[in-house]
Design a protein with these regions (language model features):
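Bacterial N-terminal signal peptides that target proteins for export
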Residues: 2-9
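Compositionally biased intrinsically disordered regions enriched in Thr/Gly
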Residues: 23-285
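C-terminal motif of bacterial Sec signal peptides marking the signal peptidase cleavage site
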Residues: 18-22
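Hydrophobic helical h-region of N-terminal Sec-dependent signal peptides
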Residues: 9-17
């Protein structure tokens, strides 16, 4: 169980204890894996074609199910492919010490590791309950969000069930600058605590929760005082085709029943609050 807990998304470890006992209904079987297209072709850089494919491993045994799906470039020796394969390894525990030129090999390594850990957890739960009815599940998907000549954005979605009353789901992601594969974090936002920027965030959340006033919005928060100073999400900023996406995982600002509060601030609105580094990434976006 100790190793499995290390995989509950390092960036949201602070809220993981609450999320494990959440009331989120289990998604339809295979949702995370089946929604990943098999082949994607994009024009990147100066009309350079780059084709992405899907690899997946999905095994159901007597103790449960483990699935890993990943989109990556066909050219697995490319800088892009190696960067996202390394990211996948980090999100799944960071123990793989081989080459990142084979996404499939990394997937197989962590799939076998998860199967072993899940079997151990299953045996512990079975002994505690005195029956073998419980079935474990762990599904993760790595997929592309956006891709252009300056950056690409990659996300990690996860659902697991470890024998408790309910399952757990979460989402993380990262935007890479293509020139050097730098990962963008919230350091690219200036003066986020100032009210003009806070209002952009409140506006996005009002739309997500479908409320019209801040008085209504604060009732959606676990801490009503967040209406005065919203924290930035644990999920890094996700650069998309049209703006920067903000994703709050369960229990960051709202109850689990609120889902994952998500909104996108258009580049035209957020640009004044971005560092020069980020502004250069979104030129002509």
């Amino acid at each position: 169980m100790k190793h499995l807990k290390t995989l509950l998304l390092p960036a949201i470890a602070a809220v993981a204890p609450f999320m494990i006992s959440s009331c989120d209904p289990k998604p339809a079987k295979g949702t995370l894996l089946d929604n990943v297209p098999n082949i994607l072709t994009n024009v990147v850089g100066d009309s350079i074609l780059q084709t992405w494919v899907k690899d997946s491993i999905s095994v159901t045994s007597d103790f449960g199910h483990v699935g890993i799906a990943m989109q990556h470039p066909v050219d697995t020796f490319s800088v892009t492919s190696q960067a996202i394969t390394e990211y996948m390894s980090e999100m799944l525990g960071g123990k793989y010490d081989g080459s990142y030129t084979s996404p499939k090999a990394v997937m197989k390594y962590y799939h076998a590791d998860l199967m072993s850990e899940l079997k151990t957890e299953y045996e512990e739960v079975k002994r505690a309950r005195g029956d073998d009815e419980v079935k474990m599940e762990w599904d993760v998907t790595f997929s592309k969000v956006a891709d252009n000549s300056k950056f690409f954005t990659y996300k990690y979605t996860m659902y697991n069930y470890l024998g408790g009353a309910h399952g757990m789901s979460a989402l993380l992601g990262v935007t890479f600058r293509k020139s050097d594969m730098r990962r963008m974090g919230w350091e690219i936002v200036r003066n986020y605590a100032n009210d003009p920027f806070q209002e952009l965030m409140r506006k996005g959340l009002r739309e997500y929760f479908e409320v019209k006033s801040d008085d209504e919005l604060k009732n959606m928060f676990l801490n009503p005082d967040h209406i005065y100073s919203l924290p930035l999400p644990e999920c890094p900023p996700l650069f998309t085709d049209h703006g920067i996406m903000f994703v709050y995982n369960p229990y960051e600002i709202g109850p689990y029943a609120a889902g994952m509060p998500t909104f996108t601030i258009p580049y035209a609105d957020i640009q004044p609050y971005l560092t020069t580094t980020a502004q250069k990434l979104i030129e002509k976006q």
